[in-house]
Design a protein with these regions (language model features):
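Phosphate/pyrophosphate-binding catalytic cores of soluble transferases and nucleic-acid-acting enzymes
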Residues: 1-302
Length: 302
């Protein structure tokens, strides 16, 4: 029997984790995370990691497995995720992959595209421009060079932004053109479930999640990491805004408002990315779990 990877996608705060746990428990299997921030053991509240009770219900892989001091990229993740899946498939016919990072999901399902070697002088030049002119100028440049990537990637993440620009400039081809086609054959079949809902309801969920993060101690967590804010892993929603609050650029209310706004924008980019994943079945958070299981079993048996 061909192994099956049940992949759960969707925007931030929509309820992917709880669905993944239900499915993993039903099929008596394990979960591999595809979240680009939950690797880091120092970042907890701001990354909305599964809570201890959730982690105890089902074995999770690639959560809290790295330090923010470690160098860790998408190529490393692809290898680690596949190794985890191979280990799971030794004892199970089914595994679960869940996350909101589209590039990480794609790396597991399709494999990474081969991108030519990058001119390091171009990389240095882009980082210099970032330092001198700020992130908005680089965002505008990417919008001109590669509007698809501009709408898909997290353009507020300097590392992701620089990566898209350095590839586009070095190769004279849009970064997005290297991410279009499956390159590697996998030893499993993929069943994709997308979870989403009405935009206003989703935005309410996002705003509520941010409020909960603040109540649970996000400000204190970020203050403890402030001296490490130069690390690329901390250039991310939830932490960047609190750092600006610490520096006096934002009041607390402005900080919270910015986190909510940037999270909503991120959700929009996530959905743009996930539209490119074929054969996805989309559901809403008020799903009927028995119907989901029936759908999965039909695909497994056929």
């Amino acid at each position: 029997m061909t192994k099956k990877l049940i992949t759960i996608i969707g925007p931030t705060a929509v309820g992917k984790t709880s669905l993944a746990i239900k499915i993993a428990k039903f099929f008596k299997t394990e979960i591999v995370s595809a979240d680009s921030r939950q690797f880091y053991k120092e970042m907890n509240i701001g990354t909305a990691k599964p809570i201890e009770n959730e982690l105890n219900q089902v074995k999770h892989h690639l959560i809290n497995n790295k330090s923010i001091h470690d160098r860790y990229n998408i190529n490393d993740y692809e290898k680690d995720a596949l190794n985890c899946l191979n280990a799971i498939f030794k004892n199970n016919n089914v595994a679960v992959l869940v996350g909101g990072s589209g590039l990480y999901i794609n790396s597991v399902i399709y494999g990474l595209d081969e991108i030519p070697e990058i001119n390091l002088e171009i990389r240095k030049s882009i980082y210099s421009e970032l330092e001198l002119k700020g992130i908005v100028k680089l965002q505008e440049k990417l919008k001109l060079l590669d509007p698809i990537s501009y709408n898909k990637i997290d353009i507020n993440n300097p590392r992701r932004l620089v990566r898209a620009l350095e590839v586009s400039i070095s190769t004279k081809k849009p970064y997005s053109s290297f991410l279009k086609k499956p390159k590697k054959k996998r030893n499993f079949n993929t069943i994709v479930l997308g979870i989403n809902q009405n935009r206003d309801l989703l935005y309410d969920r996002i705003n509520s999640r941010v409020d909960n993060m603040i109540e649970n101690g996000l400000i204190k967590e970020a203050k403890g990491l402030y001296n490490l804010k130069h690390l690329t892993s901390l250039n991310t929603i939830g932490y960047s805004e609190v750092f600006k609050h610490i520096e006096g650029d934002y009041s607390l209310n402005e900080c919270i408002s910015e986190i909510k706004k940037n999270s909503r924008r991120y959700a929009k980019r996530q959905l743009t990315w996930f539209k490119s994943i074929e054969n996805s079945k989309w559901i809403t958070p008020d799903y009927n779990f028995e119907e989901i299981v029936e759908h999965i079993n039909n695909l497994i048996n056929n």
